[in-house]
UniProtKB/Swiss-Prot annotation:
The species this protein was found in: Mus musculus
Gene Ontology BP annotations: cellular response to calcium ion
Protein name, as recorded: Copine-2
Domain C2: 6-131, 138-263
Alphabetical UniProt keywords: Calcium, Cell membrane, Cytoplasm, Membrane, Metal-binding, Nucleus, Repeat
Binding site for Ca(2+) 1: D39, D45, D97, D99
Result for mutant: D176N: Does not inhibit calcium-dependent translocation to the cell membrane. Leads to the constitutive (calcium-independent) attachment to the cell membrane
Amino acid sequence: MAYIPDGGAPTAGAIPLGSQCCVCKVELSVSGQNLLDRDVTSKSDPFCVLFIEDNGRWMEFDRTETAVNNLNPAFSKKFVLDYHFEEVQKLKFALFDQDKSSAQLDEHDFLGQFSCSLGTIVSSKKITRPLLLMNDKPAGKGVITIAAQELSDNRVITLSLAGRKLDKKDLFGKSDPFLEFYKPGDDGKWMLVHRTEVIKYTLDPVWKPFTVPLVSLCDGDLEKPIQVMCYDYDSNGGHDFIGEFQTSVLQMSEARDGVPLEIECINPKKQRKKKSYKNSGIIILRSCKIHRNYSFLDYILGGCQLMFTVGIDFTASNGNPLDPSSLHYINPMGTNEYLSAIWAVGQIIQDYDSDKMFPALGFGAQLPPDWKVSHEFAINFNPTNPFCSGVDGIAQAYSACLPHIRFYGPTNFSPIVNHVARFAAQATQQQTATQYFILLIITDGVISDMEETRHAVVQASKLPMSIIIVGVGNADFAAMEFLDGDNRRLRSHTGEEAARDIVQFVPFREFRNAAKETLAKAVLAELPQQVVQYFKHKNLPPTNSEPA
């Protein structure tokens, strides 16, 4: 049975659930019981997909792993969401039987779904509900259980493990070992926390290091027991038990690089039957590192300032500002699309800058007295002090400069990008997470210096800097989408790849009839992630942060 979510095919990647500077994150654990059996010769191979409602459309957020040949799966992959008390966050959990390796959901059999708000799950802590068909009628079989846990502890643990001389389980070959980690649940039963990858054809596996939130592994309690199970993978889902052991984070933390911790893997049945039994192999904990996974809010609370600069397009294609058809025409309500974009972004960002003094620059205009074209001028006509006091100051300087300049061209972005990048480069000399620069460019048309702009953006991607581009009017903004590296990483004309995606482009026309906060959410959606990504890459913790 094919499945297409309401509103069309899902969008890959995570959808930001509002602002990322919320108070807490919530982790959702999903399991299924008595699911429909869609396979003829074996049991279903279920996986769960989480959709989030965004502007009336269901958008794919994430997927669990596939539980092979299992009608009662407990998925080790968790869904981690930002929780906002003031918003109704609608969620849909859909279960599928994996038939092919395709990422397209209509290639898999639909097993059922359940929809509710995040608040419903959080207030109940754990809910169990019957699965429904797409028409909201009962699926006939199968229930879903969703448990919520607040991730208020931002510590994460990275474990690197290996095995030595594990029991051979395959008749004509060696074992295909993997590990499962469990913690005690509230109901007294062991709860699956993490499953490693399978290492094929070996009795001496080396697993990839993995990182999980400390609260997921042990509820933040370093002494809480952790059960580790070792299995030999079987493609039909009937994995062979190799052995087990119990440990704790406190014990595992004894392992350091160069000083591994070795733990015997015990099969209790073999131990009872054979007096000569020693173990079923050794699990080697090569390293255990606990560190903090800092959030955007951690950096803001740590004193990081968001340094905001506005760049405004004054090219002739905007039209004469005295003409009501001009994009720079200020209507009787005292606004236009340029001012709306400045207000939408600036009103939020100004709260994160203590002095609220923002440079406001223009490009593409001829300036008095000699009427030379400039692509990097202060709109208050004070090149030594281009700062405006708050968003109000930017709006006032913008309105005041319109009668005194001549709109011209071309539409060159690179001078303003390089202008802000120079200040961002100076900030890196401090080697602290105290400043992050945001450039808002508002423009009506096609970039003239695309080659130079690509190079400037690639260089800026190495700095504490993000670029927001708001396109006003009805021009073709295909080039802007190219700079916004959501689908593929931007490269300069020399072939150098951007260190990270720092450009967010939004066409204003999509928000003309929407609430003003809608534009702000869209424009600022990627910013918290970009801030964290930069400081994390540079190994810069928030100032005054506590050790893990």
